[in-house]
């Protein structure tokens, strides 16, 4: 294990770091694009797995283009909403990454924990409330905030 003695601030991602939820989202993308055929599903799955930290707001328009589906703002939002309905409860129910829950509870007073995720902000906050994590993190950043900008803002705010 890495020594934490020299750190005050720790950034956390969510999927695959706090909860074992990467496969939940992979399966949801495949389910969402299943009507478009196996070739599109395979392309979507491979892209998602290679670009895990990319927001669904960036992925879904790309996947719609691959599927040959008209992608106006309303259609993109429709697919994003469907995706959210598929994943939210499954993410909450997914297994914790081993040791993370205990670590977060044990060290929430010692460190500044900041959650930075590509999951939409309101959905991420709902998930964190359901998991009793809102008191663990000093700040929770979700999409449309980029991870890079969220980290930069935090480092400025905490003068790191």
Predicted features along the sequence, with ranges:
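Active-site neighborhood of HAD-like aspartate-dependent phosphohydrolases
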Residues: 1-46
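Short, acidic loop-to-helix structural element flanking the phosphoryl-transfer center
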Residues: 6, 88-115, 125, 149-152
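Short beta->alpha linker loops
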Residues: 24, 55, 95, 99, ...
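An amphipathic alpha-helix signature
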Residues: 26, 30, 53-61, 80, ...
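Helix-loop "lid/cap" segments that line or gate small-molecule binding pockets
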Residues: 32-34, 55-71, 154
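N-terminal polybasic phosphate/anion-binding patch
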Residues: 41-54, 61, 65
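Metal-dependent phosphoesterase signature
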Residues: 64-101, 111
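Substrate-recognition "cap/lid" segment bordering the active-site pocket of phosphatases
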Residues: 114, 120-160
């Amino acid at each position: 294990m890495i020594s934490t003695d020299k750190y005050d601030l720790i950034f956390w991602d969510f999927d695959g770091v706090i909860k074992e939820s990467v496969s939940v989202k992979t399966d949801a993308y495949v389910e969402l694009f299943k009507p478009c055929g196996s070739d599109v599903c395979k392309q979507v799955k491979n892209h998602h797995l290679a670009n895990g930290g990319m927001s669904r707001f960036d992925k879904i328009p790309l996947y719609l283009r691959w599927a040959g589906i008209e992608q106006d703002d309303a259609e993109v939002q429709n697919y994003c909403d469907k995706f959210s309905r598929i994943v939210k409860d499954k993410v909450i129910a997914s297994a914790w990454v081993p040791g993370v829950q205990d670590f977060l509870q044990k060290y929430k007073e010692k460190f500044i924990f900041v959650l930075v995720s590509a999951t939409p902000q309101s959905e991420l906050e709902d998930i964190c409330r359901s998991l009793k994590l809102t008191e663990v993190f000093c700040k929770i950043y979700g999409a449309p905030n980029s991870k890079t900008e969220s980290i930069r803002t935090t480092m400025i705010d905490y003068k790191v």
